[in-house]
Amino acid sequence: MLCAAFAAWIYLGFVLPFRAAAAGRDMLAVRIQGYEASDVLDMLQFLRAHPDAAAIQHGIYAGPALVFPVALAALLFLLMKRARPGGVFFGRAIPAAVIAALFFLPILYGLADCGETLLGALLFPPATPSDQATTMAANILPILVRLKFVVLVVTLILLIRFAALSHRSEQD
């Protein structure tokens, strides 16, 4: 429920006002399809010329975008624990090391999402990074967003799989 409240706060309090201030543009962080380095540089130029949109984006980076990934990572971790990963894969028991790695996935999601937020806060106005830092951030941000969404999708698929398997074994 807390994650849903954060998502609603982000959408209603920041995404919609940003779209209004940016003539229909979306923040990079909410583009599910991802983005490229050129999109980052384009957004940087846009925000430098539009201080209202820059202030809204800075507000999300300074508040809910730092808390939401941590809350969602904790929720995913707890759901993974409740789903009790385990069982067999191709007739062999899943090794303990693999199960431990599965529990690391929600943590990796949280790190990637927080990394994207922190790097965005250091790149976009009111920050004034050097040209070298801008180039580096523009190249790293697309990698972080792809990592974030891939890990999130894999975690959700695994949660569904383990929940279905544990539910089926309880019925047997």
Where are these regions (language model features)?
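Interfacial segments of alpha-helical transmembrane regions
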Residues: 1-3, 91-108
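Hydrophobic core of alpha-helical transmembrane segments in multi-pass integral membrane proteins
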Residues: 1-13, 73-76, 153-160
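Interfacial loop at the N-terminal end of multi-pass membrane proteins
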Residues: 1-60, 128
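Juxtamembrane loop-transmembrane helix junctions in multi-pass integral membrane proteins
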Residues: 49-52, 56-59, 87-100, 129-143
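Hydrophobic alpha-helical transmembrane segments
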Residues: 59-81
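Alpha-helical transmembrane segments of integral membrane proteins
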Residues: 64-71, 99, 103, 145-152
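Alpha-helical transmembrane segments of multi-pass integral membrane proteins
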Residues: 105-160
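Short, charged juxtamembrane terminal tails flanking transmembrane helices
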Residues: 164-172
